[in-house]
Design a protein with these regions (language model features):
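Rhodanese-like catalytic fold shared by cysteine-dependent sulfurtransferases
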Residues: 1-23, 31-74, 83-138
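N-terminal glycine-rich beta->alpha transition that marks the start or flank
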Residues: 27
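Short, surface-exposed ligand- or partner-binding patches at beta-edge/loop junctions that are enriched
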Residues: 77-78
Length: 138
């Protein structure tokens, strides 16, 4: 799956793949964002972390993923609106992960140039959610 467009899926498609095809959902938002609400059953591995100038790329994102998943594991990555998950999917693909899908619209939804909602995210699509920290977090 090298074509970026073919690896982006809707929240409903992500949920279907989790329930019927055994895909793991990795929420790449910060720990605080994850704790406030996330897709039910998701794992939290932040691709960006707080730094001196705001959010910065996590130096150990790929190594944490390599420790948690086989390179051929079916994985969906998601974030708040779709930007960080695209970064995560790209990093994982470059590291040799072969079955990574990027959930477009993230948790909250995709926004247009004027801030209007253009596609509802997981939380707005009525899909199963939960809150709290990831007990598997490092």
């Amino acid at each position: 799956m090298s074509d970026r467009d073919s690896t982006r899926i809707s929240p409903a498609e992500a949920h279907a793949k989790m329930t019927s095809e055994g895909f793991a959902y990795v929420d790449v938002r910060t720990e605080d964002e994850f704790a406030a609400g996330h897709p039910a059953g998701a794992r939290n591995v932040p691709v960006m972390v707080a730094g001196a100038a705001g959010l910065e790329p996590s130096a150990d994102f790929v190594s944490v993923m390599e420790g948690a998943f086989a390179k051929d594991a079916p994985i969906i990555v998601g974030c708040k609106m779709g930007g960080r998950s695209a970064r995560a999917a790209s990093a994982l693909g470059a590291a040799g992960f072969t079955r990574v899908l990027d959930q477009r619209a993230g948790w909250d939804g995709a926004r247009g140039s004027f801030g209007e909602l253009t596609e509802p995210g997981w939380s707005r699509a009525g899909l199963p959610t939960e809150s709290g920290s990831d007990p598997r977090a490092r």
